[in-house]
Amino acid sequence: MKKALALILAAAMSCSLVLTGCGGGNAAAGSASTGAAAAGAQSLTLATGGTTGTYYAVGGVMSTVLNKKLTKSSLTVTSTGASKANIQLLSDGEANLAIVQNDVMHYAATGTDLFEAEGKYESFSSVCGMYDETVQLVTTNANIKSVKDLKGKTVCVGDAGSGTEFNAKQVLAAYGMSFDDITVNNASFGDSADSLKDGKIDAAFVVAGAPTTAVVDLSTAAQVYVIPVDGAERDSLMKDYAFYTKTTIPAGTYKGQDADVETVSVRATLIAADDVSEDSVYELVKAMFDNQEELVKGHEKFNNLKLEDATKGIDVKFHPGAVKFFKEKGIDVA
């Protein structure tokens, strides 16, 4: 069943960019190799996300930059249905590497929430955390100042069955609330922003890198307020779910946001199938940090690739190649 689902997702949603290059693509999202990978190098397929999304663009930059540096492997980028689909594709051998949210990989490794019906996926390992995907509770109602003020309100919690929906449940639970306390609305980030602008909903959970385009666009049409997730409730949330990390949304991130906002984030994380060689993963993660400046030129998200944050919020075992790299840097992840 898992195999069939993964193949359907791959066929319906993937657009593979082969290393020999293909015309007409966005340079930032391409995977044409301009390097000279050694003969016999392991060819690795990197599963990302939709072609208009950040994962795909970030993966394309990795391929473009790192294929000039790698000798043990070469990268081919493929577009997918993002985190959950990527886990399935790795499990079924349709991909070797993937970018996923760390909460989704936790669900996969434990067979919970998004993966409760399917059971555990155990044939993948963590490589490194890349950047924050911030839990942003957004409203245009100045009277909503706390998560507790959502009681009785209409709140968008992301698409039905999405990772965002589970994040919303977890945040509400930390404040002693549940979906029974709100009127649940399911929609994408873009649609929820439109509904906020039109007054159809009172608030929306958005889980994405800040600033998020949908929220930026909303702030040009209405006064936006970002509600904090902080204090004892945040501490409780992080105790219950190790994949959350503390995050501050700086003042000025959105138009009219005059003060810092405390909240939590999940992390966009690079993972690898367990059968990818230790040497290949070691060389890859080392090349990412050694060539960060060049990666940043391709996509600003690589500004957030920091050694001190690369293992935070990750509770899934690390690949031996990553263990070797971090050990050399004085970080014990074994």
Predicted regions located by residue number:
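Extracytoplasmic
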Residues: 41, 72, 82, 92, ...
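Bilobed "Venus flytrap"/periplasmic-binding protein-like clamshell domains
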Residues: 41, 45-69, 73-77, 132-198, ...
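Pocket-lining segment of extracytoplasmic ligand-binding domains
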Residues: 102-104, 111-115, 179-270
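Short, low-complexity disordered leader/linker segments with a strong preference
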Residues: 1-44, 334
